[in-house]
Structure formats: structure tokens, C-alpha cells
Amino acid sequence: MKGLPALLLLLIGCVSSFGSQDVPLRVLAEKLNIHIGFAAGNNFWSLPDAEKYMEVAKREFNILTPGNQMKWDTIHPERNRYNFEPAEKHVEFALKNDMIVHGHTLVWHNQLPGWLTGQEWSKEELLNILEDHVKTVVSHFRGRVKIWDVVNEAVSDSGTYRESIWYRTIGPEYIEKALIWAKEADPDAILIYNDYNIEEINAKSNFVYNMIKNLREKGVPIDGIGFQMHIDYRGINYESFKKNLERFAELGLQIYITEMDRGFPLGGSVGYYLKKQAEVYRRIFEICLDNPAVRAIQFWGFTDKYSWVPGFFKGYGKALIFDENYNPKPCYFAIRELMEEKLKER
């Protein structure tokens, strides 16, 4: 693969420091007319190493997703009370540092407050609650949040609607209604559907494709598709991924890579896995940069120090592009090298 000799040299020391002569990813991304970003951790401004965290974030990225601060349990903790303060801090940091904000998420089956899940609702009651939530949150951030994950993970791995509180009580039309309400609250926002395990052509991505196709044929305002891309350490079928992006693009959708990471087993050869990780990230970026429908590529975090992977997948980790000490990893350099090559081709 093109670029691997340089990559192998980088692997000799496993990591390298970022030098003043090096071009940050966001600068290259802007020249390529794409956004590159990350999901910001909870209260990152209060971390013991907050200064370093923010220094790297604003240097490298031009799009930010609040990881948890816009989810129901945080932003709507009581039926008649909204708490915007945690999310506001993320938005303020992003806008101050010339990043756009990707809102996450308006409708999901997880991280719901007890007042919502602790009792039964009629269809009409739940529709009213959902409408109030979507319109209130989107209106609050109107003009400041450019992209919204309106509906998140509404489809099961088997390719059917997920049996969530929304689907059981309202039916599949909750997806359509949430999109319509979001567009009413901010006509200029980019509205997307976001999900995992849909990067390749499979039963789940087929269902999502047909669902979105039907929504667009009905005139429902859906602008894009979000591929989370929490990638298995063995990688993905690149040809299937490429064709999948192409068919969603043919629907007229903008494409967003929203939550990417790629961990690996911690008990094996670190050098080998770092090399494979760099190869996988480079190939994914190459496919994305070759598709003009892809508007942003975001990681679920950026430093291994605060990655979610070790806490959820025992024995796995090192999923992101900076190590625990904020040193750029081989995958960082592989991505940067590819972006530089793409610029030379233009």
C-alpha cells in the first residue's frame, strides 16, 4: 500500500511528537473541503490535563460533537425542565475555535431519563413529549448547531425497527415526525440518521437504505446519513464499504462518518497492531476522500487516554489517533500523509 515505507519508519518508535513544522489535520481537511473532528468528553474543561486536551483539539479539528451532553438524560432531566448548560460549554468551545457543531442526539433508545421510562404513555402523550423535546432543543441551538443526529440507532442488527419506547408506543412514524419537527425548528440545519454496523452492505444497511429512500420519496426532510464506524480490529470489507457509500450518495444524501474508532487486543504485538490500525484508517479515509458526498469524518474522541473502548470491550484499546500522552500515533501520520497526497492530486 502506498505510503507504508514511511509508516514503518514511524513505527520504530511507535509514536512521534508533533513538531511546529507539521501541518494539523484540520488545515489539510479544509483545503480538501471536508471536516475532520471528534466527540468531546464530559466536562473536558475540568480534566486534570484539560489544557493539553483543548490545545490538541483546537489545533487538529474543525468539527465537534458533544458526546453525551445533548442526550435526553442530561439535557431534559425532568419533564418540564431542560438543562442546556453542559451542552452550551461544548458549543461555546467549538464556535470560539472555528469548529462547526454536530448535535448528538435528539431521538435515541438509550440514556433516557427515569421520568420518561418509568411509566406508560399513550401514543398521543409520547408524541407530544417528543415534539416538545425536538423543537425545544433544536430551537435553543438554532444557527449554532449545524448538523443534527435527529434519530440514532433506530434499526436492529437483523434489519428491523428496534423495539424502543418510541417504536412500541408510536410506531415507525416517530422517525418521520422527528425529522419534520427538527426542520421546523431550524430550517437551515442538516438533518441526518445515524447508526452503527451499516458501513458494509448487509441486512441492516439494506433496511436503513430503504427506510431513508422511502422517507425522501415522501418529501421528509432528511439530508444525510451517519456511519458511526466503531470498527472491528480486523478491519472491514473495503469494496463493500465503497459501494455502500456510493448507493447512499445516489439518494442525494450527504455522508458523515460520525463516531469512528478502531481498537485492538492489548495482549498482542503492539507494533503489529499499530501498523494494521494505520493501514485500516488510511484505507477508510482514502475511500471517503474519493467520494464527494462525504462531508465529515469524526472520531469518538481523539486520545486513547479517554477512549470508551477499554471500558466496554475488556482487553481491547488504543483505538484513537493520539496515545495516552497526546502523542500522534502511526495512524495519525498515515491519515495526514494521505491527505497531503490527495491535495497534490488536485
Curated annotation (Swiss-Prot):
Protein's recorded name: Endo-1,4-beta-xylanase B
Catalyzed reactions per annotation: Endohydrolysis of (1->4)-beta-D-xylosidic linkages in xylans
Gene3D superfamilies recorded: Glycosidases
EC code(s) of this entry: 3.2.1.8
A Pfam entry, by short name: Glyco_hydro_10
Record's signal peptide: 1-19
Keyword Hydrolase appears in the UniProt entry: yes
Span of domain GH10: 41-338
The entry's keywords: Carbohydrate metabolism, Glycosidase, Hydrolase, Polysaccharide degradation, Signal, Xylan degradation
GO biological process: one example: xylan catabolic process
Family named by the database record: Belongs to the glycosyl hydrolase 10 (cellulase F) family.
Active site: 153, 259
SUPFAM superfamilies the UniProt entry points to: (Trans)glycosidases
Molecular functions per Gene Ontology: endo-1,4-beta-xylanase activity
Enzyme class: hydrolase
